[in-house]
Amino acid sequence: MSGGGGDDVVCTGWLRKSPPEKKLRRYAWKKRWFILRSGRMSGDPDVLEYYKNEHSKKPLRIINLNFCEQVDAGLTFNKKELQDSFVFDIKTSERTFYLVAETEADMNKWVQSICQICGFNQAEESTDSLRNLSSASHGPRSSPAEFSSSQHLLRERKSSAPSHSSQPTLFTFEPPMTSHMQPALSTSAPQEYLYLHQCISRRTENSRSASFSQGTRQKSDTAVQKLAQSNGHCINGVSNQVHGFYSLPKPSRHNTEFKDSTYDLPRSLASHGHTKSSLTGSETDNEDVYTFKMPSNTLCREFGDLLVDNMDVPTTPLSAYQIPRTFTLDKNHNAMTVATSGDSAIAPPPRPPKPSQAETPRWGSPQQKPPIGENSRSVAATIPRRNTLPAMDNSRLHRASSCETYEYPTRGSGESASWSAESPGKTAVGRSDSASSDENYVPMNPGSSTLLAMERAGDNSQSAYIPMGPGPHHFDPLGYPSTALPIHRGPSRGSEIQPPPVNRNLKPDRKAKPTPLDLRNNTVIDELPFKSPVTKSWSRINHTFNSSSSQYCRPISTQSITSTDSGDSEENYVPMQNPVSASPVPSGTNSPAPRKSTGSVDYLALDFQPGSPSPHRKPSTSSVTSDEKVDYVQVDKEKTQALQNTMQEWTDVRQSSEPSKGAKL
């Protein structure tokens, strides 16, 4: 090791060195022989050198500790072969060197030696935020097995913290990992360390990561279970839609008609088809095939709360919990019985006129809605489209109209939970070959359905949102049925209804752009060692590394080094600026040269002006010190001759009219 015999060798040993940050995955971590040299006695800079082996004479690289900014000890690394090692880093202005020691004593020895030479103090953020953790967890770590257990725990936080965060964040664990690691921690760490690592905030967060919160979920389950127990066959469509989220009993009736699918429309309501043709003989003969009882008003109100409050349940094709609408129709289209509760003594609305054609996209005059009670609440209901209108009673015809979106009362008719679960577009495709099937298509996205309804309606804002009060049902001018609205709590005025926010990044065909960024961040965390609660950091108070701050922060022995370096850099600085400053002569003549390099540049630039250099040379030389005059003479003699030769060649080529300018010295 003939790398400077007079240097003070502070520390030597084997360390495993990291490749550059961009090559951590492709290149291996090489084991090198490191020597820490102090220039206290010789006046040389403090350096950290590493060699290929102990007997090498030429170092592979010399790390100048004058540019060292920070040292971190006790880093965590997920590389398999380095999980049980002790990692520390040296951050310089050019590169961050990650070094791996075999034992904790070696790491502490290197870190203390480097910090002592550089004059580092422990960072305030490390002492404030990690005072308890550092004393409790970093001290007792004496074996690789214990460090492996803690490092195994630290790997859980890699997706939530950056690789170079200035202040390590306290991490939480998944409940299985916490229970698995609890015995190891309880035997090797103090009690307060266990409290920090076994905090239960992650458990509540894990419960919140489900589709809905506990409070909403319990409320929703209670409402659905009550509704299912009261009237199981009434929620056939809901059991098909939300069977993944709620445990609902299977319907005991109509299994053969619906076949456990929300797109099987009751045959009496098939759109674009004659009612006689859509009804079979067995269905029309039995008067009770499509008749069922309604739940009580209390249960209907709870079910309305479930639909309005719990927005985490997946949306259905019509943005509502849709239950197959069931009616009882006879062969002659003269009766359509709808089973109601005790509140069925309401006056029927006026009978609309019979349409002129059997197959029309829409039909004539609007119909009235029965009055609503004071305490009744409404939800958005969608009734399947019917184009063939038989001769019915007024009260029955009120419920067999085209596919409309309106506020259906909860108490007034007792039919609030009996909604349509079928998308009219799907039904038209499956059961009818009518040419106007596109008119019945309803998008599955709640946001897009609302926008589609508003676009079709034009300026008619009332076609999209219908007020609660009694009034005619609206149809859009193109003959399309108004699309189903998202689930809302029925307000007293239609102007208060607002559609829910739509996250369009959740569409299946949409490619989210942040995905590559997340993957890149994860790979960086996997590749680079990161800080942990046991990490200690040392750095300077002032991180601006100019000449004055370096002399202030460095030890006294290095002040002579910085002064000699500044003198050497001055000589090298003047020749580099000569070619640049030779062209802007007028701006250079007006500057007085307050600095060393500026004065020398002005002096050299004025040599080539005929008649003007002598008046300007005297004030520029008089404004600087005598030591700098010596530098001017030494540099001017060489560089001025070179610049004169260049100018002479330029004048010869251009055939300048002033050939004497290049010959002047």
Swiss-Prot record:
SMART domains per UniProt: PH
Phosphotyrosine modified-residue sites: 263, 290, 441, 632
Entry annotated with the keyword tRNA-binding: no
Residue numbers of Phosphoserine PTMs: 2, 135, 142-143, 149-150, 160, 165, 211, 220, 261, 278, 282, 365, 402, 420, 423, 532, 612
GO biological process terms on file: cell migration; integrin-mediated signaling pathway; intracellular signal transduction; osteoclast differentiation; phosphatidylinositol 3-kinase/protein kinase B signal transduction; positive regulation of cell population proliferation; positive regulation of epithelial cell migration; positive regulation of mast cell degranulation
A GO CC term assigned to this protein in UniProt: cytoplasm
Residue ranges of domain PH in the record: 8-119
Keyword line: Cell membrane, Cytoplasm, Membrane, Phosphoprotein
Compositionally skewed regions (Polar residues) per UniProt: 160-170, 548-566, 578-600, 646-659
Record's compositionally biased regions (Low complexity): 412-423
Chain intervals for the UniProt region annotation (Disordered): 131-183, 340-442, 491-517, 548-631, 646-665
Cell location: Cytoplasm; Cell membrane; Membrane raft
GO molecular function: phosphatidylinositol-3,4,5-trisphosphate binding; phosphatidylinositol-3,4-bisphosphate binding; protein domain specific binding; protein phosphatase binding; transmembrane receptor protein tyrosine kinase adaptor activity
Phosphothreonine: residues bearing it: 262, 275, 284, 328, 382, 388, 405
Gene3D superfamilies: Pleckstrin-homology domain (PH domain)/Phosphotyrosine-binding domain (PTB)
Span(s) of short sequence motif SH3-binding: 348-355, 499-508
Post-translational modification remark: Phosphorylated upon EGF stimulation. Phosphorylated on tyrosine residues by HCK upon IL6 signaling. Phosphorylated on tyrosine residue(s) by the thrombopoietin receptor (TPOR), stem cell factor receptor (SCFR), and T-cell and B-cell antigen receptors, gp130, IL-2R and IL-3R. Phosphorylated upon stimulation of TNFRSF11A/RANK by TNFSF11/RANKL. Dephosphorylated by PTPN11.
SUPFAM superfamilies: PH domain-like (SSF50729)
Subunit structure: Part of a complex composed of EEIG1, TNFRSF11A/RANK, PLCG2, GAB2, TEC and BTK; complex formation increases in the presence of TNFSF11/RANKL. Interacts with HCK. Interacts with SHC1; may mediate interaction with receptors. Interacts with SYK. Interacts with PI-3 kinase. Interacts with GRB2 (via SH3 2 domain). Interacts (phosphorylated) with PTPN11. Interacts with TNFRSF11A (via cytoplasmic domain). Interacts (phosphorylated) with 14-3-3 family proteins SFN, YWHAB, YWHAE, YWHAG, YWHAH, YWHAQ and YWHAZ; prevents interaction with GRB2 and attenuates GAB2 signaling.
Domain remark from Swiss-Prot or TrEMBL: The SH3-binding motifs mediate interaction with SHC1 and GRB2.
PANTHER family: GRB2-ASSOCIATED-BINDING PROTEIN (PTHR45960), GRB2-ASSOCIATED-BINDING PROTEIN 2 (PTHR45960:SF1)
Family named by the database record: Belongs to the GAB family.
Main function: Adapter protein which acts downstream of several membrane receptors including cytokine, antigen, hormone, cell matrix and growth factor receptors to regulate multiple signaling pathways. Regulates osteoclast differentiation mediating the TNFRSF11A/RANK signaling. In allergic response, it plays a role in mast cells activation and degranulation through PI-3-kinase regulation. Also involved in the regulation of cell proliferation and hematopoiesis.
Protein known as: GRB2-associated-binding protein 2
